[in-house]
Amino acid sequence: MDVGELLSYQPNRGTKRPRDDEEEEQKMRRKQTGTRERGRYREEEMTVVEEADDDKKRLLQIIDRDGEEEEEEEEPLDESSVKKMILTFEKRSYKNQELRIKFPDNPEKFMESELDLNDIIQEMHVVATMPDLYHLLVELNAVQSLLGLLGHDNTDVSIAVVDLLQELTDIDTLHESEEGAEVLIDALVDGQVVALLVQNLERLDESVKEEADGVHNTLAIVENMAEFRPEMCTEGAQQGLLQWLLKRLKAKMPFDANKLYCSEVLAILLQDNDENRELLGELDGIDVLLQQLSVFKRHNPSTAEEQEMMENLFDSLCSCLMLSSNRERFLKGEGLQLMNLMLREKKISRSSALKVLDHAMIGPEGTDNCHKFVDILGLRTIFPLFMKSPRKIKKVGTTEKEHEEHVCSILASLLRNLRGQQRTRLLNKFTENDSEKVDRLMELHFKYLGAMQVADKKIEGEKHDMVRRGEIIDNDTEEEFYLRRLDAGLFVLQHICYIMAEICNANVPQIRQRVHQILNMRGSSIKIVRHIIKEYAENIGDGRSPEFRENEQKRILGLLENF
Protein backbone atom coordinates (compact mmCIF):
# COMPACT_ATOMS: atom_id res chain seq x y z
CA MET A 1 0.00 0.00 0.00
CA ASP A 2 1.12 3.62 -0.62
CA VAL A 3 0.64 6.39 1.97
CA GLY A 4 -2.80 7.31 0.65
CA GLU A 5 -4.05 3.73 0.86
CA LEU A 6 -2.72 3.35 4.41
CA LEU A 7 -4.55 6.47 5.60
CA SER A 8 -7.84 5.69 3.86
CA TYR A 9 -7.92 1.98 4.79
CA GLN A 10 -10.98 0.95 6.87
CA PRO A 11 -11.28 -2.65 8.12
CA ASN A 12 -14.51 -4.53 7.36
CA ARG A 13 -16.14 -5.01 10.77
CA GLY A 14 -19.11 -6.98 9.44
CA THR A 15 -22.84 -6.60 10.43
CA LYS A 16 -24.75 -8.23 13.25
CA ARG A 17 -27.71 -10.28 12.06
CA PRO A 18 -30.90 -9.24 14.12
CA ARG A 19 -33.15 -11.77 15.84
CA ASP A 20 -36.69 -12.23 14.39
CA ASP A 21 -38.52 -10.54 17.33
CA GLU A 22 -36.33 -7.44 17.01
CA GLU A 23 -36.92 -6.89 13.29
CA GLU A 24 -40.25 -5.01 13.51
CA GLU A 25 -39.01 -2.72 16.26
CA GLN A 26 -35.88 -1.90 14.28
CA LYS A 27 -37.92 -1.12 11.15
CA MET A 28 -40.04 1.43 13.07
CA ARG A 29 -36.94 3.00 14.65
CA ARG A 30 -35.28 3.23 11.25
CA LYS A 31 -38.28 5.10 9.77
CA GLN A 32 -38.28 7.65 12.60
CA THR A 33 -34.57 8.30 12.72
CA GLY A 34 -33.57 7.55 9.11
CA THR A 35 -33.52 11.11 7.83
CA ARG A 36 -31.92 12.55 10.98
CA GLU A 37 -29.24 9.78 11.11
CA ARG A 38 -28.33 10.11 7.45
CA GLY A 39 -27.80 13.84 7.87
CA ARG A 40 -25.65 13.37 10.97
CA TYR A 41 -23.69 10.54 9.25
CA ARG A 42 -22.86 12.80 6.31
CA GLU A 43 -21.57 15.49 8.68
CA GLU A 44 -19.43 12.95 10.59
CA GLU A 45 -18.14 11.47 7.34
CA MET A 46 -17.04 14.88 6.11
CA THR A 47 -15.22 15.51 9.41
CA VAL A 48 -13.41 12.14 9.25
CA VAL A 49 -12.39 12.73 5.62
CA GLU A 50 -11.06 16.22 6.45
CA GLU A 51 -9.09 14.82 9.42
CA ALA A 52 -7.71 12.00 7.26
CA ASP A 53 -6.69 14.49 4.57
CA ASP A 54 -4.88 16.60 7.18
CA ASP A 55 -3.06 13.49 8.52
CA LYS A 56 -2.13 12.48 4.99
CA LYS A 57 -0.72 15.93 4.20
CA ARG A 58 1.32 15.98 7.41
CA LEU A 59 2.72 12.47 6.75
CA LEU A 60 3.63 13.32 3.16
CA GLN A 61 5.36 16.51 4.34
CA ILE A 62 7.43 14.49 6.86
CA ILE A 63 8.41 11.95 4.15
CA ASP A 64 9.36 14.71 1.69
CA ARG A 65 11.40 16.51 4.36
CA ASP A 66 13.24 13.30 5.31
CA GLY A 67 13.98 12.57 1.65
CA GLU A 68 15.39 16.07 1.16
CA GLU A 69 17.58 15.69 4.26
CA GLU A 70 18.91 12.34 2.98
CA GLU A 71 19.71 13.89 -0.40
CA GLU A 72 21.53 16.74 1.30
CA GLU A 73 23.55 14.33 3.45
CA GLU A 74 24.75 12.26 0.44
CA GLU A 75 28.19 13.38 -0.63
CA PRO A 76 28.44 13.89 -4.40
CA LEU A 77 30.76 11.41 -6.15
CA ASP A 78 33.77 13.19 -7.58
CA GLU A 79 37.49 12.59 -8.02
CA SER A 80 38.24 13.73 -4.48
CA SER A 81 35.67 11.46 -2.82
CA VAL A 82 36.82 8.44 -4.87
CA LYS A 83 40.45 9.09 -3.88
CA LYS A 84 39.36 9.31 -0.24
CA MET A 85 37.44 6.04 -0.56
CA ILE A 86 40.40 4.25 -2.16
CA LEU A 87 42.72 5.52 0.58
CA THR A 88 40.33 4.19 3.24
CA PHE A 89 40.18 0.86 1.40
CA GLU A 90 43.98 0.59 1.26
CA LYS A 91 44.32 1.42 4.97
CA ARG A 92 41.72 -1.16 6.01
CA SER A 93 43.20 -3.80 3.72
CA TYR A 94 46.69 -3.22 5.16
CA LYS A 95 45.38 -3.21 8.75
CA ASN A 96 43.54 -6.50 8.23
CA GLN A 97 46.60 -8.09 6.65
CA GLU A 98 48.79 -6.87 9.51
CA LEU A 99 46.46 -8.21 12.22
CA ARG A 100 46.09 -11.58 10.45
CA ILE A 101 49.87 -11.97 10.37
CA LYS A 102 50.20 -10.85 14.01
CA PHE A 103 47.35 -13.00 15.41
CA PRO A 104 46.95 -15.93 12.97
CA ASP A 105 45.31 -18.18 15.58
CA ASN A 106 43.11 -15.56 17.22
CA PRO A 107 40.24 -14.53 14.90
CA GLU A 108 38.75 -12.19 17.52
CA LYS A 109 41.74 -9.89 17.06
CA PHE A 110 41.29 -9.42 13.31
CA MET A 111 37.55 -10.03 12.84
CA GLU A 112 36.54 -6.39 13.33
CA SER A 113 39.12 -5.22 10.77
CA GLU A 114 37.73 -7.82 8.34
CA LEU A 115 34.22 -6.45 8.75
CA ASP A 116 35.54 -2.92 8.19
CA LEU A 117 37.32 -4.10 5.04
CA ASN A 118 34.15 -5.76 3.77
CA ASP A 119 32.18 -2.54 4.43
CA ILE A 120 34.54 -0.36 2.38
CA ILE A 121 34.48 -2.88 -0.49
CA GLN A 122 30.68 -2.58 -0.48
CA GLU A 123 30.94 1.22 -0.49
CA MET A 124 33.22 1.08 -3.54
CA HIS A 125 30.32 -0.22 -5.63
CA VAL A 126 29.38 3.42 -6.13
CA VAL A 127 32.46 3.83 -8.37
CA ALA A 128 30.73 1.56 -10.92
CA THR A 129 28.30 4.42 -11.57
CA MET A 130 31.20 6.63 -12.75
CA PRO A 131 33.36 4.75 -15.30
CA ASP A 132 35.09 8.06 -16.13
CA LEU A 133 36.84 7.73 -12.76
CA TYR A 134 38.06 4.16 -13.33
CA HIS A 135 41.55 5.51 -14.04
CA LEU A 136 41.85 6.39 -10.33
CA LEU A 137 41.45 2.71 -9.40
CA VAL A 138 44.45 1.95 -11.59
CA GLU A 139 46.60 4.99 -10.77
CA LEU A 140 46.20 4.46 -7.01
CA ASN A 141 46.86 0.69 -7.33
CA ALA A 142 43.39 -0.22 -6.05
CA VAL A 143 42.98 -2.77 -8.87
CA GLN A 144 46.13 -4.61 -7.80
CA SER A 145 44.98 -4.56 -4.18
CA LEU A 146 41.57 -5.94 -5.16
CA LEU A 147 43.19 -8.70 -7.21
CA GLY A 148 45.36 -9.54 -4.21
CA LEU A 149 42.25 -9.94 -2.05
CA LEU A 150 40.90 -12.64 -4.39
CA GLY A 151 43.24 -14.96 -2.51
CA HIS A 152 42.15 -13.74 0.95
CA ASP A 153 41.84 -16.51 3.56
CA ASN A 154 38.23 -15.49 4.20
CA THR A 155 36.13 -16.38 1.15
CA ASP A 156 33.56 -13.77 2.23
CA VAL A 157 36.15 -11.10 1.37
CA SER A 158 37.12 -12.70 -1.96
CA ILE A 159 33.42 -13.03 -2.89
CA ALA A 160 32.87 -9.35 -2.02
CA VAL A 161 35.74 -8.45 -4.39
CA VAL A 162 34.27 -10.66 -7.13
CA ASP A 163 30.90 -8.94 -6.67
CA LEU A 164 32.59 -5.53 -7.01
CA LEU A 165 34.60 -6.53 -10.10
CA GLN A 166 31.45 -7.92 -11.70
CA GLU A 167 29.72 -4.57 -11.28
CA LEU A 168 32.76 -2.57 -12.44
CA THR A 169 33.00 -4.68 -15.62
CA ASP A 170 29.27 -4.62 -16.41
CA ILE A 171 29.20 -4.38 -20.20
CA ASP A 172 26.73 -1.47 -20.29
CA THR A 173 28.90 0.48 -17.84
CA LEU A 174 32.07 -0.24 -19.86
CA HIS A 175 30.48 1.21 -23.00
CA GLU A 176 29.57 4.41 -21.14
CA SER A 177 33.25 5.37 -21.04
CA GLU A 178 35.48 3.56 -23.53
CA GLU A 179 38.58 5.29 -22.17
CA GLY A 180 37.89 4.36 -18.54
CA ALA A 181 36.96 0.82 -19.57
CA GLU A 182 40.18 0.32 -21.56
CA VAL A 183 42.29 1.42 -18.58
CA LEU A 184 40.46 -0.92 -16.19
CA ILE A 185 40.51 -3.95 -18.52
CA ASP A 186 44.22 -3.39 -19.26
CA ALA A 187 45.00 -3.41 -15.54
CA LEU A 188 42.91 -6.55 -14.93
CA VAL A 189 44.54 -8.42 -17.83
CA ASP A 190 48.04 -7.33 -16.75
CA GLY A 191 47.25 -8.57 -13.24
CA GLN A 192 46.24 -12.00 -14.64
CA VAL A 193 42.72 -11.61 -13.32
CA VAL A 194 41.44 -14.85 -14.89
CA ALA A 195 44.16 -16.98 -13.26
CA LEU A 196 43.33 -15.43 -9.86
CA LEU A 197 39.60 -15.88 -10.39
CA VAL A 198 40.12 -19.56 -11.27
CA GLN A 199 42.22 -20.11 -8.13
CA ASN A 200 39.37 -18.62 -6.11
CA LEU A 201 36.79 -20.76 -7.95
CA GLU A 202 38.68 -23.91 -6.99
CA ARG A 203 38.02 -23.32 -3.28
CA LEU A 204 34.39 -22.14 -3.40
CA ASP A 205 31.71 -24.52 -2.09
CA GLU A 206 28.58 -24.16 -4.23
CA SER A 207 26.39 -25.82 -1.61
CA VAL A 208 26.72 -22.49 0.26
CA LYS A 209 24.45 -19.94 -1.46
CA GLU A 210 26.84 -17.00 -1.10
CA GLU A 211 29.69 -19.01 -2.62
CA ALA A 212 27.47 -20.26 -5.45
CA ASP A 213 26.62 -16.60 -6.16
CA GLY A 214 30.37 -15.92 -6.15
CA VAL A 215 30.84 -18.54 -8.88
CA HIS A 216 28.05 -16.96 -10.95
CA ASN A 217 29.54 -13.47 -10.60
CA THR A 218 32.99 -14.79 -11.54
CA LEU A 219 31.58 -16.19 -14.79
CA ALA A 220 29.87 -12.83 -15.39
CA ILE A 221 33.25 -11.04 -15.11
CA VAL A 222 34.70 -13.37 -17.76
CA GLU A 223 31.69 -12.87 -20.05
CA ASN A 224 31.86 -9.08 -19.67
CA MET A 225 35.58 -8.94 -20.42
CA ALA A 226 35.27 -11.36 -23.36
CA GLU A 227 32.53 -9.23 -24.92
CA PHE A 228 34.51 -6.01 -24.46
CA ARG A 229 37.85 -7.53 -25.52
CA PRO A 230 37.39 -10.84 -27.41
CA GLU A 231 41.16 -11.37 -27.81
CA MET A 232 41.51 -12.01 -24.05
CA CYS A 233 39.62 -15.31 -24.49
CA THR A 234 42.77 -17.16 -25.56
CA GLU A 235 44.83 -15.97 -22.61
CA GLY A 236 41.96 -16.60 -20.19
CA ALA A 237 41.45 -20.17 -21.42
CA GLN A 238 45.16 -20.91 -20.99
CA GLN A 239 45.11 -19.57 -17.42
CA GLY A 240 43.06 -22.55 -16.26
CA LEU A 241 39.56 -21.31 -17.09
CA LEU A 242 38.85 -23.86 -19.83
CA GLN A 243 39.98 -26.72 -17.60
CA TRP A 244 37.80 -25.49 -14.72
CA LEU A 245 34.74 -25.14 -17.00
CA LEU A 246 35.10 -28.73 -18.22
CA LYS A 247 35.54 -29.96 -14.65
CA ARG A 248 32.43 -28.06 -13.52
CA LEU A 249 30.36 -29.36 -16.43
CA LYS A 250 31.15 -33.01 -15.68
CA ALA A 251 30.78 -32.62 -11.89
CA LYS A 252 28.04 -34.87 -10.51
CA MET A 253 25.81 -32.03 -9.34
CA PRO A 254 22.15 -31.24 -10.08
CA PHE A 255 21.51 -28.91 -13.01
CA ASP A 256 21.53 -25.27 -11.89
CA ALA A 257 22.10 -21.71 -13.13
CA ASN A 258 25.87 -22.05 -12.74
CA LYS A 259 26.04 -25.11 -15.00
CA LEU A 260 24.03 -23.21 -17.61
CA TYR A 261 26.39 -20.23 -17.29
CA CYS A 262 29.44 -22.52 -17.65
CA SER A 263 28.05 -23.81 -20.96
CA GLU A 264 27.52 -20.21 -22.17
CA VAL A 265 31.05 -19.11 -21.28
CA LEU A 266 32.51 -22.25 -22.89
CA ALA A 267 30.70 -21.49 -26.16
CA ILE A 268 32.05 -17.90 -26.03
CA LEU A 269 35.65 -19.06 -25.50
CA LEU A 270 35.48 -21.45 -28.48
CA GLN A 271 33.89 -19.03 -30.93
CA ASP A 272 36.28 -18.29 -33.84
CA ASN A 273 39.25 -19.41 -31.73
CA ASP A 274 41.33 -22.32 -33.04
CA GLU A 275 43.79 -22.12 -30.13
CA ASN A 276 41.03 -22.70 -27.59
CA ARG A 277 39.50 -25.44 -29.76
CA GLU A 278 42.85 -27.24 -29.83
CA LEU A 279 43.30 -26.77 -26.08
CA LEU A 280 39.85 -28.23 -25.41
CA GLY A 281 40.74 -31.26 -27.53
CA GLU A 282 43.99 -31.76 -25.60
CA LEU A 283 42.05 -31.59 -22.31
CA ASP A 284 39.74 -34.43 -23.48
CA GLY A 285 36.99 -31.85 -23.82
CA ILE A 286 35.36 -33.62 -26.78
CA ASP A 287 34.68 -36.62 -24.53
CA VAL A 288 33.29 -34.33 -21.81
CA LEU A 289 30.90 -32.69 -24.30
CA LEU A 290 29.76 -36.07 -25.66
CA GLN A 291 29.21 -37.43 -22.13
CA GLN A 292 27.11 -34.40 -21.16
CA LEU A 293 25.07 -34.57 -24.37
CA SER A 294 24.47 -38.34 -24.09
CA VAL A 295 21.90 -37.57 -21.36
CA PHE A 296 19.63 -36.11 -24.06
CA LYS A 297 19.70 -39.06 -26.48
CA ARG A 298 16.58 -40.61 -24.93
CA HIS A 299 15.30 -37.80 -22.71
CA ASN A 300 14.26 -34.27 -23.52
CA PRO A 301 15.55 -31.42 -21.33
CA SER A 302 13.15 -30.94 -18.40
CA THR A 303 13.23 -27.11 -18.46
CA ALA A 304 13.85 -24.28 -20.92
CA GLU A 305 17.11 -23.52 -19.09
CA GLU A 306 18.33 -27.10 -19.46
CA GLN A 307 17.46 -26.98 -23.16
CA GLU A 308 19.49 -23.79 -23.46
CA MET A 309 22.47 -25.54 -21.85
CA MET A 310 22.08 -28.46 -24.26
CA GLU A 311 22.15 -26.07 -27.23
CA ASN A 312 25.26 -24.34 -25.83
CA LEU A 313 27.04 -27.70 -25.58
CA PHE A 314 26.04 -28.59 -29.14
CA ASP A 315 27.31 -25.20 -30.34
CA SER A 316 30.61 -25.80 -28.53
CA LEU A 317 30.94 -29.22 -30.17
CA CYS A 318 30.23 -27.80 -33.65
CA SER A 319 32.79 -25.07 -33.03
CA CYS A 320 35.44 -27.64 -32.01
CA LEU A 321 34.77 -29.75 -35.11
CA MET A 322 36.00 -26.88 -37.29
CA LEU A 323 39.45 -28.19 -36.31
CA SER A 324 40.52 -31.40 -38.10
CA SER A 325 42.34 -32.82 -35.03
CA ASN A 326 39.08 -32.66 -33.08
CA ARG A 327 37.26 -34.61 -35.81
CA GLU A 328 39.62 -37.51 -35.09
CA ARG A 329 38.84 -37.24 -31.37
CA PHE A 330 35.12 -37.08 -32.18
CA LEU A 331 35.46 -40.25 -34.28
CA LYS A 332 37.39 -42.12 -31.57
CA GLY A 333 34.96 -40.95 -28.89
CA GLU A 334 32.07 -42.57 -30.85
CA GLY A 335 30.47 -39.20 -31.48
CA LEU A 336 28.99 -40.43 -34.76
CA GLN A 337 27.20 -43.28 -32.99
CA LEU A 338 25.73 -40.88 -30.42
CA MET A 339 24.50 -38.41 -33.07
CA ASN A 340 23.05 -41.24 -35.17
CA LEU A 341 21.18 -42.55 -32.12
CA MET A 342 19.81 -39.06 -31.42
CA LEU A 343 18.50 -38.83 -35.00
CA ARG A 344 16.66 -42.14 -34.53
CA GLU A 345 15.20 -41.33 -31.12
CA LYS A 346 13.33 -38.26 -32.44
CA LYS A 347 13.89 -36.14 -29.32
CA ILE A 348 14.56 -32.39 -29.17
CA SER A 349 18.28 -33.09 -29.59
CA ARG A 350 17.73 -34.42 -33.13
CA SER A 351 18.04 -31.12 -35.02
CA SER A 352 21.27 -30.22 -33.19
CA ALA A 353 22.70 -33.71 -33.77
CA LEU A 354 22.09 -33.17 -37.49
CA LYS A 355 24.08 -29.93 -37.34
CA VAL A 356 26.96 -31.72 -35.57
CA LEU A 357 27.07 -34.44 -38.26
CA ASP A 358 27.19 -31.72 -40.93
CA HIS A 359 30.25 -30.17 -39.22
CA ALA A 360 31.92 -33.56 -38.70
CA MET A 361 31.71 -34.66 -42.36
CA ILE A 362 32.28 -31.50 -44.38
CA GLY A 363 35.42 -31.10 -46.51
CA PRO A 364 38.29 -33.55 -47.07
CA GLU A 365 38.94 -33.61 -43.28
CA GLY A 366 35.54 -35.31 -42.89
CA THR A 367 36.44 -38.36 -45.03
CA ASP A 368 37.00 -40.78 -42.13
CA ASN A 369 33.77 -39.70 -40.45
CA CYS A 370 31.85 -40.16 -43.72
CA HIS A 371 33.08 -43.75 -44.10
CA LYS A 372 32.33 -44.53 -40.46
CA PHE A 373 28.83 -43.06 -40.81
CA VAL A 374 28.02 -45.55 -43.57
CA ASP A 375 29.54 -48.40 -41.52
CA ILE A 376 27.20 -47.68 -38.57
CA LEU A 377 24.20 -47.75 -40.97
CA GLY A 378 23.80 -44.00 -40.93
CA LEU A 379 22.27 -43.99 -44.43
CA ARG A 380 19.17 -45.67 -42.95
CA THR A 381 18.86 -42.69 -40.62
CA ILE A 382 19.68 -39.76 -42.90
CA PHE A 383 17.51 -40.63 -45.93
CA PRO A 384 14.15 -40.67 -44.08
CA LEU A 385 15.07 -37.16 -42.88
CA PHE A 386 15.88 -36.22 -46.48
CA MET A 387 12.57 -37.57 -47.77
CA LYS A 388 10.46 -35.67 -45.26
CA SER A 389 11.20 -32.80 -42.90
CA PRO A 390 9.96 -33.54 -39.34
CA ARG A 391 6.58 -32.05 -38.44
CA LYS A 392 7.37 -30.83 -34.92
CA ILE A 393 10.54 -29.07 -35.96
CA LYS A 394 9.18 -25.60 -35.06
CA LYS A 395 8.98 -26.50 -31.38
CA VAL A 396 12.78 -26.60 -31.06
CA GLY A 397 13.41 -23.38 -32.95
CA THR A 398 14.80 -25.03 -36.11
CA THR A 399 13.22 -24.03 -39.41
CA GLU A 400 12.42 -26.40 -42.25
CA LYS A 401 15.03 -24.58 -44.34
CA GLU A 402 17.76 -25.19 -41.73
CA HIS A 403 16.82 -28.87 -41.54
CA GLU A 404 16.96 -29.31 -45.32
CA GLU A 405 20.20 -27.31 -45.47
CA HIS A 406 21.97 -29.66 -43.04
CA VAL A 407 20.62 -32.85 -44.64
CA CYS A 408 21.64 -31.74 -48.16
CA SER A 409 25.06 -30.64 -46.90
CA ILE A 410 25.60 -34.08 -45.29
CA LEU A 411 24.63 -35.88 -48.53
CA ALA A 412 26.96 -33.60 -50.53
CA SER A 413 29.82 -34.41 -48.11
CA LEU A 414 29.12 -38.15 -48.39
CA LEU A 415 29.18 -37.97 -52.21
CA ARG A 416 32.41 -35.98 -52.10
CA ASN A 417 34.29 -38.18 -49.62
CA LEU A 418 33.05 -41.76 -50.03
CA ARG A 419 34.94 -44.26 -52.14
CA GLY A 420 34.54 -47.90 -53.18
CA GLN A 421 31.79 -50.05 -51.70
CA GLN A 422 30.46 -47.33 -49.41
CA ARG A 423 29.98 -44.93 -52.33
CA THR A 424 28.11 -47.67 -54.22
CA ARG A 425 25.81 -48.19 -51.21
CA LEU A 426 25.06 -44.46 -51.22
CA LEU A 427 24.31 -44.31 -54.97
CA ASN A 428 22.06 -47.38 -54.73
CA LYS A 429 19.82 -45.41 -52.36
CA PHE A 430 18.96 -43.06 -55.26
CA THR A 431 17.68 -45.96 -57.39
CA GLU A 432 15.49 -47.58 -54.70
CA ASN A 433 11.67 -47.49 -54.93
CA ASP A 434 11.52 -46.22 -58.50
CA SER A 435 14.11 -43.45 -57.84
CA GLU A 436 11.93 -41.74 -55.21
CA LYS A 437 14.98 -40.00 -53.73
CA VAL A 438 15.80 -38.43 -57.10
CA ASP A 439 12.20 -37.18 -57.24
CA ARG A 440 12.59 -35.66 -53.78
CA LEU A 441 15.88 -34.04 -54.80
CA MET A 442 14.24 -32.43 -57.82
CA GLU A 443 11.29 -31.31 -55.67
CA LEU A 444 13.73 -29.49 -53.37
CA HIS A 445 15.57 -28.09 -56.41
CA PHE A 446 12.47 -26.35 -57.74
CA LYS A 447 11.43 -25.23 -54.26
CA TYR A 448 14.69 -23.36 -53.66
CA LEU A 449 15.07 -22.26 -57.29
CA GLY A 450 11.72 -20.48 -56.95
CA ALA A 451 12.82 -18.82 -53.71
CA MET A 452 16.06 -17.68 -55.39
CA GLN A 453 14.26 -16.21 -58.39
CA VAL A 454 12.14 -14.09 -56.03
CA ALA A 455 15.25 -12.95 -54.10
CA ASP A 456 17.21 -12.22 -57.32
CA LYS A 457 14.35 -10.13 -58.70
CA LYS A 458 14.29 -8.04 -55.53
CA ILE A 459 18.07 -7.55 -55.54
CA GLU A 460 18.07 -6.58 -59.24
CA GLY A 461 15.43 -3.97 -58.44
CA GLU A 462 17.62 -2.56 -55.67
CA LYS A 463 20.64 -2.47 -57.99
CA HIS A 464 18.61 -0.63 -60.63
CA ASP A 465 17.54 1.97 -58.03
CA MET A 466 21.16 2.42 -56.90
CA VAL A 467 22.35 3.02 -60.48
CA ARG A 468 19.52 5.48 -61.06
CA ARG A 469 20.60 7.42 -57.94
CA GLY A 470 24.19 7.46 -59.18
CA GLU A 471 25.49 5.15 -56.44
CA ILE A 472 28.47 2.87 -57.12
CA ILE A 473 27.99 -0.89 -56.71
CA ASP A 474 31.42 -1.88 -55.38
CA ASN A 475 32.81 -5.27 -54.33
CA ASP A 476 31.55 -4.88 -50.75
CA THR A 477 28.01 -4.22 -52.00
CA GLU A 478 28.17 -7.21 -54.36
CA GLU A 479 29.38 -9.41 -51.48
CA GLU A 480 26.52 -8.20 -49.31
CA PHE A 481 24.03 -9.07 -52.06
CA TYR A 482 25.64 -12.52 -52.45
CA LEU A 483 25.32 -13.20 -48.71
CA ARG A 484 21.66 -12.20 -48.88
CA ARG A 485 21.14 -14.64 -51.76
CA LEU A 486 22.84 -17.43 -49.77
CA ASP A 487 20.53 -16.73 -46.83
CA ALA A 488 17.46 -16.68 -49.09
CA GLY A 489 18.15 -20.27 -50.19
CA LEU A 490 21.11 -20.22 -52.59
CA PHE A 491 23.27 -22.15 -50.10
CA VAL A 492 20.83 -25.10 -50.09
CA LEU A 493 20.28 -24.83 -53.84
CA GLN A 494 24.05 -25.05 -54.50
CA HIS A 495 24.27 -28.28 -52.50
CA ILE A 496 21.22 -29.71 -54.29
CA CYS A 497 22.74 -28.95 -57.72
CA TYR A 498 26.07 -30.40 -56.60
CA ILE A 499 24.31 -33.63 -55.53
CA MET A 500 22.57 -33.73 -58.95
CA ALA A 501 25.93 -33.38 -60.73
CA GLU A 502 27.56 -36.09 -58.57
CA ILE A 503 24.82 -38.69 -59.03
CA CYS A 504 24.53 -37.97 -62.78
CA ASN A 505 28.28 -38.62 -63.11
CA ALA A 506 28.01 -41.99 -61.36
CA ASN A 507 27.43 -44.05 -64.53
CA VAL A 508 23.94 -45.04 -63.38
CA PRO A 509 21.71 -44.39 -66.47
CA GLN A 510 18.51 -44.68 -64.41
CA ILE A 511 19.46 -41.67 -62.26
CA ARG A 512 20.63 -39.47 -65.15
CA GLN A 513 17.47 -40.19 -67.18
CA ARG A 514 15.20 -39.37 -64.23
CA VAL A 515 16.94 -36.02 -63.58
CA HIS A 516 16.70 -34.95 -67.25
CA GLN A 517 13.10 -36.17 -67.50
CA ILE A 518 11.95 -34.08 -64.52
CA LEU A 519 13.86 -30.99 -65.70
CA ASN A 520 12.13 -31.22 -69.10
CA MET A 521 8.71 -31.83 -67.52
CA ARG A 522 9.04 -28.66 -65.42
CA GLY A 523 10.27 -26.57 -68.35
CA SER A 524 13.70 -26.10 -66.80
CA SER A 525 17.12 -26.85 -68.25
CA ILE A 526 20.61 -28.11 -67.50
CA LYS A 527 21.94 -24.58 -68.19
CA ILE A 528 20.41 -23.25 -64.95
CA VAL A 529 21.98 -26.08 -62.94
CA ARG A 530 25.35 -25.51 -64.64
CA HIS A 531 25.23 -21.79 -63.83
CA ILE A 532 24.50 -22.45 -60.13
CA ILE A 533 27.34 -24.99 -59.85
CA LYS A 534 29.81 -22.63 -61.58
CA GLU A 535 28.88 -19.85 -59.16
CA TYR A 536 29.32 -22.31 -56.28
CA ALA A 537 32.82 -23.27 -57.51
CA GLU A 538 33.86 -19.63 -57.96
CA ASN A 539 32.94 -18.77 -54.37
CA ILE A 540 34.69 -21.68 -52.64
CA GLY A 541 36.94 -20.44 -49.83
CA ASP A 542 40.67 -21.12 -49.60
CA GLY A 543 40.18 -23.73 -46.86
CA ARG A 544 43.63 -24.67 -45.62
CA SER A 545 45.42 -23.30 -48.72
CA PRO A 546 44.90 -21.62 -52.12
CA GLU A 547 45.98 -24.94 -53.66
CA PHE A 548 42.99 -26.67 -52.04
CA ARG A 549 40.65 -24.10 -53.56
CA GLU A 550 42.10 -24.53 -57.05
CA ASN A 551 41.89 -28.33 -56.93
CA GLU A 552 38.34 -28.26 -55.57
CA GLN A 553 37.21 -25.85 -58.30
CA LYS A 554 38.67 -28.12 -61.00
CA ARG A 555 36.97 -31.17 -59.48
CA ILE A 556 33.54 -29.49 -59.31
CA LEU A 557 33.73 -27.99 -62.81
CA GLY A 558 34.86 -31.40 -64.09
CA LEU A 559 31.49 -32.82 -62.99
CA LEU A 560 29.76 -30.50 -65.47
CA GLU A 561 31.51 -32.01 -68.49
CA ASN A 562 29.46 -35.21 -68.31
CA PHE A 563 26.30 -33.64 -66.87
UniProtKB/Swiss-Prot annotation:
HEAT repeats lie at residues 79-129, 134-176. InterPro entries: ARM-like, ARM-type_fold, CTNNBL1, CTNNBL1_N. Keywords: Acetylation, Adaptive immunity, Coiled coil, Cytoplasm, Disease variant, Immunity, mRNA processing, mRNA splicing, Nucleus, Phosphoprotein, Repeat, Spliceosome. Residues 34-45 have a biased composition (Basic and acidic residues). A motif (Nuclear export signal (NES)) lies at residues 130-140. The modification N-acetylmethionine is found at residue 1. It is linked to Immunodeficiency 99 with hypogammaglobulinemia and autoimmune cytopenias: An autosomal recessive immunologic disorder characterized by recurrent sinopulmonary infections appearing in early childhood, B- and T-cell lymphopenia, and progressive severe hypogammaglobulinemia with decreased memory B cells. Patients may develop autoimmune cytopenias, such as thrombocytopenia, or autoimmune features, such as vitiligo. This is Beta-catenin-like protein 1. It comes from Homo sapiens (Human). The gene is CTNNBL1.
